[in-house]
Protein backbone atom coordinates (compact mmCIF):
# COMPACT_ATOMS: atom_id res chain seq x y z
CA UNK A 1 0.00 0.00 0.00
CA UNK A 2 1.28 3.50 -0.86
CA UNK A 3 0.36 6.25 1.61
CA UNK A 4 1.01 9.98 1.15
CA UNK A 5 1.13 12.25 4.23
CA UNK A 6 1.07 16.02 4.60
CA UNK A 7 1.83 17.95 7.79
CA UNK A 8 1.64 21.70 8.43
CA UNK A 9 2.38 21.94 12.17
CA UNK A 10 4.97 20.42 14.53
CA UNK A 11 2.21 18.59 16.43
CA UNK A 12 1.29 16.72 13.24
CA UNK A 13 4.81 15.28 13.07
CA UNK A 14 4.29 13.70 16.47
CA UNK A 15 0.80 12.55 15.49
CA UNK A 16 2.01 10.57 12.48
CA UNK A 17 5.64 9.62 13.19
CA UNK A 18 4.87 6.29 14.86
CA UNK A 19 2.22 5.47 12.25
CA UNK A 20 4.77 5.99 9.49
CA UNK A 21 7.28 3.73 11.26
CA UNK A 22 4.65 1.02 11.73
CA UNK A 23 3.54 1.18 8.10
CA UNK A 24 7.12 1.11 6.83
CA UNK A 25 7.88 -1.90 9.06
CA UNK A 26 4.84 -3.72 7.65
CA UNK A 27 6.07 -3.30 4.09
CA UNK A 28 3.96 -0.34 3.02
CA UNK A 29 5.48 2.62 1.16
CA UNK A 30 5.04 6.06 2.71
CA UNK A 31 5.93 9.58 1.65
CA UNK A 32 5.89 12.72 3.81
CA UNK A 33 5.26 16.21 2.46
CA UNK A 34 5.51 19.36 4.56
CA UNK A 35 4.21 22.88 4.80
CA UNK A 36 7.02 24.40 6.85
CA UNK A 37 6.05 25.99 10.17
CA UNK A 38 8.29 26.63 13.19
CA UNK A 39 10.26 23.45 14.02
CA UNK A 40 8.33 21.03 11.78
CA UNK A 41 11.27 20.12 9.56
CA UNK A 42 13.66 19.94 12.50
CA UNK A 43 11.40 17.40 14.18
CA UNK A 44 11.18 15.29 11.03
CA UNK A 45 14.97 15.35 10.78
CA UNK A 46 15.35 14.35 14.43
CA UNK A 47 13.04 11.35 13.93
CA UNK A 48 14.73 10.31 10.69
CA UNK A 49 11.65 10.78 8.51
CA UNK A 50 12.45 11.82 4.90
CA UNK A 51 10.23 14.60 3.57
CA UNK A 52 9.58 16.96 0.69
CA UNK A 53 8.74 20.62 1.37
CA UNK A 54 5.76 21.92 -0.63
CA UNK A 55 5.48 25.39 0.96
CA UNK A 56 6.10 27.56 3.97
CA UNK A 57 3.29 28.79 6.23
CA UNK A 58 3.00 32.59 6.53
CA UNK A 59 1.36 34.57 9.35
CA UNK A 60 -0.95 36.79 7.26
CA UNK A 61 -4.26 35.65 5.77
CA UNK A 62 -3.18 36.59 2.24
CA UNK A 63 0.14 34.84 2.78
CA UNK A 64 -1.63 31.68 3.90
CA UNK A 65 -3.94 31.76 0.88
CA UNK A 66 -0.98 32.06 -1.50
CA UNK A 67 0.95 29.30 0.31
CA UNK A 68 -2.00 26.91 0.30
CA UNK A 69 -2.75 27.43 -3.40
CA UNK A 70 0.89 26.86 -4.29
CA UNK A 71 1.07 23.80 -2.02
CA UNK A 72 -1.97 22.19 -3.67
CA UNK A 73 -0.35 22.60 -7.09
CA UNK A 74 2.92 21.11 -5.86
CA UNK A 75 1.15 18.27 -4.06
CA UNK A 76 -0.70 17.40 -7.24
CA UNK A 77 2.63 16.88 -9.00
CA UNK A 78 4.03 14.91 -6.06
CA UNK A 79 0.95 12.68 -5.88
CA UNK A 80 0.97 11.98 -9.60
CA UNK A 81 4.57 10.80 -9.33
CA UNK A 82 4.06 8.85 -6.07
CA UNK A 83 0.72 7.25 -7.07
CA UNK A 84 -0.74 6.84 -3.54
CA UNK A 85 -3.51 4.43 -2.64
CA UNK A 86 -4.49 6.64 0.32
CA UNK A 87 -3.66 10.19 1.47
CA UNK A 88 -3.56 11.20 5.14
CA UNK A 89 -3.53 14.64 6.79
CA UNK A 90 -3.87 16.24 10.22
CA UNK A 91 -5.95 19.21 11.45
CA UNK A 92 -6.11 22.44 9.46
CA UNK A 93 -6.73 23.10 5.78
CA UNK A 94 -7.23 19.79 3.97
CA UNK A 95 -4.86 20.65 1.15
CA UNK A 96 -4.77 17.01 0.08
CA UNK A 97 -8.54 17.13 -0.46
CA UNK A 98 -8.51 18.82 -3.88
CA UNK A 99 -5.60 16.61 -4.92
CA UNK A 100 -7.58 13.52 -3.97
CA UNK A 101 -10.61 14.66 -5.94
CA UNK A 102 -8.55 15.36 -9.05
CA UNK A 103 -6.75 12.01 -8.86
CA UNK A 104 -9.80 10.08 -7.61
CA UNK A 105 -7.89 8.87 -4.54
CA UNK A 106 -9.29 8.76 -0.97
CA UNK A 107 -8.22 11.38 1.57
CA UNK A 108 -8.67 10.95 5.32
CA UNK A 109 -8.18 13.57 8.03
CA UNK A 110 -7.39 13.17 11.72
CA UNK A 111 -8.83 16.29 13.36
CA UNK A 112 -9.26 17.54 16.92
CA UNK A 113 -9.82 21.28 16.39
CA UNK A 114 -13.50 22.26 16.40
CA UNK A 115 -12.83 25.99 16.17
CA UNK A 116 -11.05 25.76 12.82
CA UNK A 117 -14.38 26.56 11.13
CA UNK A 118 -12.99 28.15 7.97
CA UNK A 119 -10.66 25.20 7.45
CA UNK A 120 -13.61 22.80 7.81
CA UNK A 121 -15.81 24.88 5.51
CA UNK A 122 -13.23 24.87 2.72
CA UNK A 123 -11.64 21.47 3.25
CA UNK A 124 -14.27 19.00 4.42
CA UNK A 125 -16.19 18.76 1.10
CA UNK A 126 -13.09 17.29 -0.55
CA UNK A 127 -12.19 14.58 1.99
CA UNK A 128 -13.63 11.10 2.40
CA UNK A 129 -13.40 10.53 6.18
CA UNK A 130 -12.72 12.76 9.19
CA UNK A 131 -11.54 10.91 12.30
CA UNK A 132 -12.07 12.76 15.58
CA UNK A 133 -11.83 12.02 19.31
CA UNK A 134 -15.12 10.83 20.81
CA UNK A 135 -15.28 14.05 22.89
CA UNK A 136 -15.19 16.25 19.75
CA UNK A 137 -18.01 18.76 20.23
CA UNK A 138 -19.11 19.23 16.61
CA UNK A 139 -21.14 16.92 14.41
CA UNK A 140 -19.43 16.84 11.02
CA UNK A 141 -21.98 14.59 9.38
CA UNK A 142 -21.67 11.13 7.80
CA UNK A 143 -17.95 11.53 7.02
CA UNK A 144 -17.08 11.75 10.72
CA UNK A 145 -15.75 8.71 12.60
CA UNK A 146 -15.22 9.00 16.37
CA UNK A 147 -12.75 7.01 18.47
CA UNK A 148 -11.94 6.94 22.23
CA UNK A 149 -8.60 8.72 22.26
CA UNK A 150 -6.64 11.93 21.78
CA UNK A 151 -4.01 12.82 19.18
CA UNK A 152 -1.45 13.03 21.96
CA UNK A 153 -1.95 9.32 22.71
CA UNK A 154 -0.49 8.52 19.28
CA UNK A 155 2.96 9.36 20.67
CA UNK A 156 2.64 9.63 24.46
CA UNK A 157 0.72 6.42 25.18
CA UNK A 158 2.93 4.28 27.47
CA UNK A 159 3.29 1.70 24.70
CA UNK A 160 4.88 4.43 22.53
CA UNK A 161 6.80 6.65 24.97
CA UNK A 162 9.13 6.24 27.94
CA UNK A 163 10.45 9.52 29.39
CA UNK A 164 14.22 9.96 29.47
CA UNK A 165 15.37 11.07 32.96
CA UNK A 166 18.61 12.39 31.49
CA UNK A 167 16.75 15.38 30.03
CA UNK A 168 15.78 17.00 33.36
CA UNK A 169 19.14 15.91 34.80
CA UNK A 170 20.89 17.87 32.04
CA UNK A 171 19.19 20.99 33.45
CA UNK A 172 20.29 20.24 37.00
CA UNK A 173 16.86 18.96 38.05
CA UNK A 174 16.06 15.86 40.07
CA UNK A 175 12.80 14.10 40.98
CA UNK A 176 12.28 16.21 44.10
CA UNK A 177 12.48 19.57 42.33
CA UNK A 178 9.44 21.63 41.38
CA UNK A 179 9.46 22.52 37.69
CA UNK A 180 6.88 24.89 36.21
CA UNK A 181 6.69 24.99 32.42
CA UNK A 182 5.11 27.96 30.63
CA UNK A 183 3.98 27.53 27.02
CA UNK A 184 3.27 30.54 24.77
CA UNK A 185 1.86 30.25 21.24
CA UNK A 186 2.38 32.47 18.19
CA UNK A 187 -1.34 33.28 17.57
CA UNK A 188 -0.75 33.01 13.79
CA UNK A 189 -3.21 30.18 13.09
CA UNK A 190 -6.48 31.23 11.45
CA UNK A 191 -8.50 29.82 14.36
CA UNK A 192 -6.38 32.01 16.71
CA UNK A 193 -7.55 35.27 15.13
CA UNK A 194 -9.18 37.46 17.80
CA UNK A 195 -8.25 35.06 20.61
CA UNK A 196 -6.04 35.76 23.62
CA UNK A 197 -4.11 34.12 26.43
CA UNK A 198 -1.56 35.24 29.04
CA UNK A 199 -0.69 38.94 28.89
CA UNK A 200 1.20 39.60 32.14
CA UNK A 201 3.93 37.06 31.56
CA UNK A 202 6.62 38.71 33.70
CA UNK A 203 4.24 39.05 36.66
CA UNK A 204 3.42 35.34 36.44
CA UNK A 205 7.08 34.37 36.46
CA UNK A 206 7.99 36.52 39.45
CA UNK A 207 5.31 34.86 41.55
CA UNK A 208 5.83 31.32 40.24
CA UNK A 209 9.54 31.42 41.02
CA UNK A 210 8.64 31.32 44.71
CA UNK A 211 7.56 27.70 44.16
CA UNK A 212 10.24 26.31 41.89
CA UNK A 213 12.16 26.64 38.66
CA UNK A 214 10.34 28.28 35.76
CA UNK A 215 11.10 27.51 32.11
CA UNK A 216 9.40 28.80 28.94
CA UNK A 217 8.58 27.06 25.67
CA UNK A 218 7.52 29.66 23.10
CA UNK A 219 6.62 29.68 19.41
CA UNK A 220 7.53 33.38 19.20
CA UNK A 221 10.50 35.56 20.22
CA UNK A 222 10.60 36.53 23.88
CA UNK A 223 11.52 39.91 25.33
CA UNK A 224 14.91 40.46 26.95
CA UNK A 225 13.41 39.98 30.41
CA UNK A 226 11.94 36.57 29.48
CA UNK A 227 14.60 35.15 27.14
CA UNK A 228 16.75 33.76 30.02
CA UNK A 229 13.83 31.46 30.90
CA UNK A 230 13.63 29.89 27.44
CA UNK A 231 13.78 26.10 27.49
CA UNK A 232 17.39 25.11 26.65
CA UNK A 233 16.58 21.69 25.16
CA UNK A 234 15.71 20.71 21.56
CA UNK A 235 11.98 20.49 20.75
CA UNK A 236 12.06 16.70 20.42
CA UNK A 237 12.94 16.49 24.14
CA UNK A 238 10.01 18.60 25.37
CA UNK A 239 7.92 15.56 26.30
CA UNK A 240 10.73 14.06 28.35
CA UNK A 241 10.81 17.26 30.38
CA UNK A 242 7.02 17.53 30.52
CA UNK A 243 6.87 14.12 32.19
CA UNK A 244 8.91 15.47 35.12
CA UNK A 245 7.09 18.81 35.30
CA UNK A 246 5.04 19.69 38.38
CA UNK A 247 2.69 22.12 36.62
CA UNK A 248 2.25 23.12 32.99
CA UNK A 249 0.78 26.56 32.26
CA UNK A 250 0.11 27.91 28.81
CA UNK A 251 -1.89 29.06 25.84
CA UNK A 252 -1.47 25.94 23.68
CA UNK A 253 -4.11 23.22 23.58
CA UNK A 254 -1.63 20.58 22.42
CA UNK A 255 0.78 21.04 25.34
CA UNK A 256 -2.15 21.11 27.77
CA UNK A 257 -3.34 17.75 26.46
CA UNK A 258 0.20 16.35 26.33
CA UNK A 259 0.56 17.29 29.99
CA UNK A 260 -2.70 15.53 30.85
CA UNK A 261 -1.85 12.22 29.18
CA UNK A 262 1.54 12.28 30.96
CA UNK A 263 -0.13 12.86 34.34
CA UNK A 264 1.04 16.47 34.68
CA UNK A 265 -1.61 18.98 35.74
CA UNK A 266 -2.10 21.80 33.23
CA UNK A 267 -3.49 25.33 33.29
CA UNK A 268 -4.91 26.24 29.87
CA UNK A 269 -5.39 29.99 29.33
CA UNK A 270 -7.02 30.57 25.96
CA UNK A 271 -10.37 31.90 24.80
CA UNK A 272 -10.57 28.83 22.53
CA UNK A 273 -11.79 25.65 24.20
CA UNK A 274 -11.93 22.29 22.45
CA UNK A 275 -13.70 19.11 23.44
CA UNK A 276 -10.43 17.38 24.30
CA UNK A 277 -9.43 19.92 26.96
CA UNK A 278 -13.01 20.08 28.21
CA UNK A 279 -13.04 16.32 28.80
CA UNK A 280 -9.58 16.35 30.36
CA UNK A 281 -10.88 18.96 32.78
CA UNK A 282 -14.36 17.64 33.58
CA UNK A 283 -13.75 13.88 33.51
CA UNK A 284 -10.14 13.53 34.59
CA UNK A 285 -9.33 16.75 36.48
CA UNK A 286 -5.94 17.09 34.80
CA UNK A 287 -6.55 20.33 32.87
CA UNK A 288 -8.03 23.57 34.19
CA UNK A 289 -9.45 25.71 31.37
CA UNK A 290 -9.84 29.49 31.57
CA UNK A 291 -11.51 30.79 28.38
CA UNK A 292 -13.02 34.06 29.68
CA UNK A 293 -11.07 36.98 28.10
CA UNK A 294 -12.03 39.32 30.95
CA UNK A 295 -11.33 37.15 33.99
CA UNK A 296 -9.54 34.07 32.68
CA UNK A 297 -5.96 35.13 33.30
CA UNK A 298 -6.61 36.26 36.87
CA UNK A 299 -8.57 33.09 37.68
CA UNK A 300 -5.88 30.93 36.09
CA UNK A 301 -3.19 32.63 38.17
CA UNK A 302 -5.07 31.88 41.39
CA UNK A 303 -5.63 28.27 40.32
CA UNK A 304 -1.94 27.82 39.51
CA UNK A 305 -0.87 29.02 42.95
CA UNK A 306 -3.48 26.80 44.58
CA UNK A 307 -2.19 23.72 42.76
CA UNK A 308 1.42 24.51 43.61
CA UNK A 309 0.51 24.62 47.30
CA UNK A 310 -0.47 20.93 47.06
CA UNK A 311 2.52 18.74 48.07
CA UNK A 312 0.85 15.66 46.54
CA UNK A 313 0.15 17.21 43.13
CA UNK A 314 2.40 14.86 41.14
CA UNK A 315 1.07 11.72 42.81
CA UNK A 316 -2.52 12.83 42.24
CA UNK A 317 -1.68 13.45 38.60
CA UNK A 318 -0.34 9.92 38.22
CA UNK A 319 -3.52 8.42 39.66
CA UNK A 320 -5.72 10.51 37.36
CA UNK A 321 -3.59 9.46 34.40
CA UNK A 322 -4.17 5.78 35.21
CA UNK A 323 -7.91 6.30 34.86
CA UNK A 324 -7.47 8.20 31.59
CA UNK A 325 -5.30 5.46 30.10
CA UNK A 326 -7.75 2.77 31.18
CA UNK A 327 -10.50 4.47 29.16
CA UNK A 328 -8.51 5.46 26.05
CA UNK A 329 -6.77 3.58 23.26
CA UNK A 330 -3.31 3.56 21.71
CA UNK A 331 -4.11 5.95 18.87
CA UNK A 332 -1.20 4.88 16.67
CA UNK A 333 -2.46 1.30 16.76
CA UNK A 334 -5.89 2.61 15.83
CA UNK A 335 -4.53 4.61 12.89
CA UNK A 336 -2.62 1.57 11.61
CA UNK A 337 -5.85 -0.44 11.58
CA UNK A 338 -7.70 2.41 9.85
CA UNK A 339 -5.09 2.78 7.10
CA UNK A 340 -4.61 -0.93 6.46
CA UNK A 341 -8.33 -1.65 6.57
CA UNK A 342 -9.55 1.42 4.68
CA UNK A 343 -12.34 1.69 3.72
CA UNK A 344 -13.83 -1.69 4.68
CA UNK A 345 -12.81 -2.02 8.34
CA UNK A 346 -13.05 1.58 9.58
CA UNK A 347 -15.98 1.00 11.94
CA UNK A 348 -14.25 -1.68 14.01
CA UNK A 349 -10.77 -0.17 14.09
CA UNK A 350 -11.20 1.34 17.56
CA UNK A 351 -11.38 -2.06 19.24
CA UNK A 352 -8.47 -2.48 21.66
Predicted regions and their residues:
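A donor-sugar binding/catalytic signature common to diverse glycosyltransferases
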Residues: 88-91, 96, 241-280
